[in-house]
Amino acid sequence: MEYYSTHINKLIEQLSHLPGIGPKSAQRLAFHIMNMPKDQVEQLTSSITGAREKIRYCRKCCTLTDQELCPICSNPKRDASTIMVVENTRDLAAYEKTGKYERVYHVLHGAISPMLGIGPDDIRLKELMKRLQTEEIKEVIIATNSSLEGETTAMYISKLIKPTGIRVSRIASGVPVGGDLEYIDEVTLLRALEGRVDL
């Protein structure tokens, strides 16, 4: 039996596709949106549409940005000889919040996961390897999550880079196994970076 109108049901269904939003949360959000002033709803839809249309991948590091080069890659004060490889833009933001990492990044937008059918060609590895061939890189710090997929990705990247002679390191433990970097506090992230080990 349908309790709500077709439009409300459709809104609930669409909201429930968002990560971390189950049916109950989607229902709460839908009714909150229905009770918002019309101009706020229009601003919300405009922001979503605008972000989807304007946001793209940085030409260099592949993070999400609204410019050709993100603010980090276009900052001449950054040490561009060291690249930290992260799984997503949220992980990049977690390291940026520490205020201590003054080098550059490369965002993979995923991790290798044979179980989910995600292989090396499905993440931004080609772009990373191109950077290593065209830029003066001394070190690659692999900061993928400590999940099985993150470890698999780290080992794969290490094997790709080793023949180039570029130093490859992995952030130290301290980040819990299976933990996502975006949820780790700044002190733990800094210790993991400082305690990195060569692969």
Across the structure, where does each feature detected by a protein language model lie?
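Residue-level signal for pocket-adjacent positions within structured domains
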Residues: 28, 43, 56, 68, ...
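Cys/His-rich Zn2+-binding cysteine-cluster or related metal-binding knuckle/ribbon modules and their
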Residues: 2-8, 17, 27-92
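Long C-terminal interaction/binding lobes of large macromolecular proteins
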Residues: 102, 129-141, 146-199
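Solvent-exposed alpha-helical segments within well-ordered globular domains of core cellular machineries
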Residues: 9-13, 27-31, 42, 46, ...
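Conserved phosphate/pyrophosphate-binding and hydrolysis machinery centered on Walker-type P-loop NTPases
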Residues: 19, 38, 51, 63, ...
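Conserved, well-folded catalytic cores of nucleic-acid-processing
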Residues: 14, 18, 36, 51-54, ...
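Extended interfacial segments that mediate partner engagement and assembly in macromolecular machines
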Residues: 26, 75-141
